[in-house]
């Protein structure tokens, strides 16, 4: 899957306005896909990587409801709660975005590659 990677620096057009008030925010973001629009309502859903079935179901449920009501979901693309939240947002026909602990040129964990692909195809990042 080819998806252009780009960078946006603090103070440049495209850098998220909601991050500007914080002095310790990154000076540069590396992006694959898209960033949420400044006017887009967002909610973060995070949790354990090794979690119960109930935990996964709740992450997916809340993400689906939020997405169905126009709220973009942000999580980390890790196994467990994060992946469940992204899946739920996609089921809710919404956009979902990942904040990664690795480079945007790889998918970690590899088993979430199909999920990452669907996120990008759906206009997320």
Q: For each predicted feature, which ranges?
A:
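Glycine-biased, small-residue-rich flexible motifs in mid-sequence functional cores and linkers
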Residues: 2-125
